[in-house]
Amino acid sequence: PDPIPGSVRAEYGLIGFRQAVQEIHFPESREQMETARDRLAFEELLRLTLALKFLKGRGREKTRVRVQRPDLKPFVKSLPFPLTGAQKRVIAEILRDMASPYPMNRLLQGDVGSGKTLVAAAVSYAAIQKGYQAALMAPTEILAAQHEKTLRKFLEPMGVKVGLLTGSLTPKQKTAMREAIERGEIQMVAGTHALVQEATAFHRLGLVITDEQHRFGVHQRQMLGEKGDHPHVLVMSATPIPRTLAL
């Protein structure tokens, strides 16, 4: 059945879904292609709007994760370069969200190389400073390892213990890392889907960061969030797509 009711299609002059799919791929005229495109775009925007309404309502659940008045001065002083104006602004906005009684759901969008991981490290340090753990999940082991290396560079000078959990670790290495995470010894962990497996438990997860650069699964992001008590969520993306925008 067509996901858009006939009454709505009639009101907005939209063609049916099957017809739109057929004509967007095999249009007999430019007008036919534009009509099909309008129909599919309408549905995409409708789905996005409904998802936003649902998530805004769900977001009223309160969180116990309150990151209030963190001191980032030591972190900023440890950096070999000054933060840009945009980085300062974004960090301030994220920290304001994390101080709220409601769980944050925020998209951090920026081109590759724009410093998104530095921003993630800064807000992770704020959460860790208040006794929480932070986790960054990436869709590939290579990307997870890159993030772990960058996070280690920024956070280890601050005394933060950073770990990596991926599927390629030996069973013994995985067990040791998971035990350290559960005990709270690892304060910041980067990893892949191994982070959401049932065997992985956190001591006090307060911030979930995911890298959507390669369209990481929304379901897996939600599974990681369920490892904590309504933790704050930050999604990093170079090119936001409708799914990542619907936070």
Regions found by a protein language model. Give the residues of each.
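Conserved pre-motif I regulatory segment
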Residues: 62-109
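Walker B catalytic acidic pair
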Residues: 192-193, 211-212
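Conserved motor-coupling elements within RecA-like helicase/translocase cores
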Residues: 168-189, 196-205
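Conserved SF1/SF2 helicase motif Ia
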Residues: 105, 119-149, 156-161
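Conserved glycine(s) of the Walker
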Residues: 115
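Post-DEXD/H (motif II) to motif III coupling segment of the RecA-like Helicase ATP-binding lobe
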Residues: 202-207, 213-247
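Upstream accessory/linker segments immediately N-terminal to the RecA-like ATPase cores of bacterial MutS
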Residues: 1-79
